[in-house]
């Protein structure tokens, strides 16, 4: 038994406070009581959900380059949760590609549902019962698919273009993105002078800011204009109130396009640039403003739409007036303080490669592609995922992260995908990092969209399926589109709404917020459950409840006759998601002591769901029947939702299913021409972390960084896959890949919080602080030689947590406002956990 240690840490010293806590060691029959040190949290520290730390060394959190960007996927992203910019860092011509999350074509619609679905639903199901899959497919195409004329897409806007006059060829050039400060910087020398350019997108001031300066007076000469205009509209140059010289360039137009809408529907868009120069003179020529002999120049860019009924011109004017009343130093300080409050909650150190750490980021990535080890680049990739989450999704964001976040290269929006919200994995992946990465607030705009789906999905449920409750399918837009999509194989994913709604359950599990559970989560879950209780029918042969017609997105199978088919009854992903919905709702009812009648129905239905099944190859079946896969190299593995992010397959509780999941992975990724995309690679990191296979998880993390990530470390969907003619940026690989790193270091989906469950040999020494675990805990971990040294726990709610390391477990009481330190010897003095590893 460990002796009681009475120590409390303060910022500068250690003093005796005489406080202890209780730890109980997990044995096969009981927890044996023991004591360990309880360190009192200094009073000035924030609770776990908002703790900030000033990093001792922020250099690892910088992307930097020795040349300007030539392509969009070389530019550096900045964002404030709504306004995005891709900064090219040009020496003579700076380009910042502007975007805004609500710049959407399309419009709300109440006529998306196919009018024949409800009438022919029973006929489609009977054909599926009779294994007449080709005939059922024909009816699904005719009576279930929707062909919306007003769905829309997020659209790119245009570039802010700065033509910069340099007296000679710039030297000592460097451009960088500091993740800690969220500032993109360009610096170089010309004619003996040093020039600096800083760009950031400010959430407190609702604007994007560009500041140009030199180390001597009167050196700034440049022209400012909009270029590469992608929206219909007009540009005007004017002088703001009280100014004689022109200082404002304004674009006024519309988000119109004809691929995903009718070319006449879309939001009104306004973008205004206010130019503030220290000394010098401004003149207008056509649609640009020229600045001569200024000491410094500050550009304030405001963007607004009428997405939620606002007046874009008024909103832009208000933002510019407020920002223009502040100095650049004040704007910068407000921005960095706001960003630090989120970003500095988590720090990570995975070790270093002294040679690689001195290289520019693009060279480091290519070195990894060539086989070099660079653990610091993996740490940078993790923090980059958090940075992009902060930059793209804030508590006050009007919309959640779309396929491309809040940035837009014009590629996804100009092909069949659209730059929308895909609910068959991509939007979910965008937020897998949020809770564990200590950015819980970033999910707020997602929950708002889920509330919209909950409302609009009620119309789809009754009109398409004749049921109560609500339903949503594979794709959605800002106005809550919930009808099926326009294509077989992907459009009829009937549990898509459930999958995205499960993010609300994760938020509850991490936060323990009973008010959120009662008032936000419960109505959404109850409505979804009411739909599936009415929608599911008994399979005449298997005697279980089934969904259908439904897809296992976006995959297909061979019918008994060899035909290519995709619509079936109760694909495994549907079973996993309905099981999760019902079981979590039952738990919510227990916690809230409500709805006993519905609870009884859910309990009964839960017992009638089909089991997860192992197929003829030893694989986890993707469908209720053991179909032959039509595309065995397919990128989607939707049935493995059961392994991650859900917890229906585990090494301890379902070892045979865990083995089948591994067989599924081996068969899929070893197929010739496996569809290797950014998000499917990120999946592999998380899957193998759950299987506690650290080397495979690390292998696929390296593969993600080296094979599906460009020089700016943004991930992309590879050209030639899923209809993409070229590599197309998607933010899901960044966020889900970063979530995979967290999953390798900390897992809390089971009974215990598991420390270092999948630590690879490539990270022998390191630390991470500020990760969040389910139950309201925040965890710091230090390790050396691949062995735990110290874990530190903070609880924002107070309570008991079970900690597991390797094959041993201990039970820890963590009072609110206390920092409990758990050294390795706490586990060494325990007996083995009964859990099988």
Task: Enumerate the predicted regions with their spans.
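C-terminal capping/lid segments that line or modulate ligand- or cofactor-binding pockets
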Residues: 73-98, 102-103, 123, 143-145, ...
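Short, well-structured active-site flanking segments
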Residues: 394-406, 443-444, 511-518, 534-548
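N-terminal secretory signal peptides
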Residues: 1-26, 39, 52
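Beta-strand segments within the central parallel beta-sheet cores of soluble alpha/beta enzyme folds
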Residues: 223-225, 445-448, 463-464, 516-526, ...
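Aromatic-residue-lined binding/catalytic grooves and analogous aromatic/hydrophobic interfacial grooves
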Residues: 53-489, 506-508, 526-529, 591-594, ...
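Hydrophobic (often cysteine-bearing) scaffold residues that line and stabilize catalytic clefts
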Residues: 377-381, 426, 443, 496, ...
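Extended, hydrophobic alpha-helical segments in both membrane/secreted and soluble proteins
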Residues: 496-507, 520-533, 680, 697, ...
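N-terminal export signals
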Residues: 30-50
